[in-house]
A protein has these predicted regions:
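Juxtamembrane intracellular "pre-TM" segments in multi-pass secondary transporters
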Residues: 2-10, 257-294, 320, 486-487
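Cytoplasmic helix-loop-helix junction between adjacent transmembrane helices
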Residues: 127-166
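C-terminal ends and interior cores of transmembrane alpha-helices
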Residues: 88-117, 367-381
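Residue-level signature of mid-helix packing/kink "hotspots" within the transmembrane helices
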Residues: 32, 60-68, 136, 170-171, ...
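Extracytoplasmic gate region of multi-pass secondary transporters
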Residues: 34-38, 289-344, 403, 437-438
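Glycine-rich segments within core transmembrane alpha-helices of 12-TM secondary carriers
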Residues: 156-185, 339, 427-437
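Cytoplasmic membrane-interface "Motif A"-like loop-to-helix N-cap segments
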Residues: 76-87, 352-366
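C-terminal transmembrane helical hairpin of 12-TM major facilitator-type secondary transporters
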Residues: 356-406
Length: 487
């Protein structure tokens, strides 16, 4: 490239990274908002957590399959328009979510009662499945875009920066939905019928509280009846703005803005190859590539540990270590913040010291996970809460390295022509982990106690460590390098 081309390329490279970060964070706005509506739906309609739990487990599996399907599509489509399609549909679905009670009232002719609630649950279940099918249009096209704009030797560092979009999106939507649930809705504290309904629907929650806390909980729900609707409508509106932002900001490949393609990313394919040649390339680089399947298995174990801490950490700290719900809740925030730090450092180390061989960084990270989860488990019940949180925080620091880098390794080995398909395979396998981390650990905790939850978690981390260790000497990417490049 000429000096002018290099300057333009850097501009478009960072424009693509930042644009996809913002775009993907907005996908989180219309995906992670549902959990904030659950307390309102429970109070107003009595929908149980068990019902929500079954739906959310199914949704996690659907999302994993969607990442695979959209990964295959992303390698053959324009990344910008792929994202636009997915986010547009998700914004419409979220608007329908907010109108769910109105739609069910129109269908059933009722505003409450068994038939109405069953209809509402079915509607929400269908919408959640559809929403997560189109949520799969988020990461795969982002991955395609970035692998076309970032050289393999820089991908670990810059993809680690990009991966912060997950936490940024989750952080902002938590603040936004928390505000909406506390400042919108209709005040119905003076309606005795609604009060009786809320008292009955929240009985399983308030029975564990003292009288003053129970009254405050019920009163808060009555002051914000219908607030849950705004946790869908406002993110849906933001998603519409996000669609416009993506259209204006992103372009598909360097060639689309008059720039040459990345050096050092030569493959057996070019843009004129036939469909049959592309399928053969996918078979070689993805479906029959033991490296991709090894990474998928490793990511399965990584996700088990990550989701176990996020889903069960606060509960364990309250039940087994006697922490308050407020203190236990900080575990998720601290885990995420330290995870971002670990993710950025892991990416930099991979490129700086291991020449892009990110699997070596992952090995050290998994060793850290094993060490600090084991230390956390071994601490006595009398341990200071700050020490407990520090142990989990350091575990988060280490676990987010592999969580980000496994996708980078898959992209480099499948090459930019099949990166999204490879990440789709890895993502699909990793999301099967929700069965173990969700239902599995819940079952183990109920029947065998927390001790065996942690023993199982540590065993999963060890297996992930061994799988990644077996890849130690694997080359850094799957591109066809000239002799001059490899010397």
């Amino acid at each position: 490239m000429t000096a002018e081309q290099t300057k333009r390329f850097k501009y478009w490279q960072w424009r693509t990274i930042i644009g996809t970060m913002i775009g993907y964070a907005i996908f989180y706005f219309v995906r992670k908002n549902f959990s904030f509506a659950i307390p309102g739906l429970t109070a107003e309609y009595g929908i149980s957590k068990t019902t929500f739990g079954v739906i959310m487990t199914l949704v996690g599996l659907i999302y994993g399959v969607s990442k695979f399907v959209n990964g295959v599509l992303a390698d053959r489509t324009n990344g910008r328009w792929h994202m636009v399609t997915g986010l547009s549909v998700c914004s419409v679905i979220n608007f329908i979510f907010g109108c769910g009670a109105i739609i069910c009232a129109w269908i059933t002719g009722q505003t409450y009662g068994t038939t109405f609630i069953h209809t509402l649950v079915v509607l929400f279940g269908v919408l959640l499945i559809l929403n997560n099918m189109f949520q799969g249009c988020g990461f795969p096209p982002c991955n395609r875009l970035i692998t076309h704009w970032v050289p393999p030797k820089e991908l670990a560092t810059k993809m680690s920066i990009w991966n912060a979009s997950h936490s940024i999106g989750a952080f902002i939507i938590a603040i936004l939905c928390g505000y909406l649930m506390g400042h919108t809705g209709t005040d119905m504290t003076g309606d005795p019928e609604m009060r009786q309904r809320v008292v009955e629907n929240t009985a399983s929650i308030t029975e564990k509280m003292n009288a003053a806390s129970a009254e405050a909980y019920v009163t808060n729900a009555l002051q914000h009846v219908g607030a849950w609707q705004w946790t869908f409508w406002v993110p849906a509106a933001i998603a519409v703005l996000g669609v416009i932002f993506i259209i204006v900001t992103l372009r598909d490949t360097p060639k689309s803005v008059g720039l040459p393609e990345l050096e050092g990313t030569k493959t057996q394919l070019d843009e004129h190859d036939s469909s049959e040649e592309f399928k053969a390339f996918l078979r070689k680089k993805v479906f029959l590539n033991p490296m991709i399947w090894g990474l998928a298995v490793a990511d399965f174990f990584v996700y088990i540990v990550r989701f176990a801490v996020l889903d069960w950490g606060p509960t364990f700290l309250q039940e087994s270590r006697g922490l308050s719900s407020s203190m236990a809740g900080w575990t998720v925030a601290i885990f995420e913040v330290c995870g971002i730090t670990g993710m950025l450092l892991a990416g930099w180390i991979s490129d700086k010291f291991f020449g892009g061989r990110a699997q070596r960084t992952c090995v050290f990270c998994m060793a850290g996970v094993i060490l600090f989860i084991s230390l956390f488990f071994a601490l006595p019940e009398s341990t200071d809460p700050v020490v407990l949180l520090m142990m989990l925080a350091v575990a988060g620091f280490f676990i987010y390295g592999p969580q980000a880098l496994i996708g980078v390794i898959a992209s480099n080995h499948a090459t930019k022509k099949a990166a999204s398909t490879a990440n789709g395979v890895v993502g699909m396998v990793s999301y099967v982990s929700v069965v173990v981390s969700g239902w599995g650990f819940g079952f183990i905790s109920d029947h065998f106690g927390w001790r065996w939850v942690f023993i199982t978690m540590i065993a999963m981390a060890v297996l992930g460590f061994l799988v990644l260790l077996s890849m130690w000497n694997t080359k850094s990417d799957g591109y066809e390098h000239d002799a001059a490049e490899t010397n």
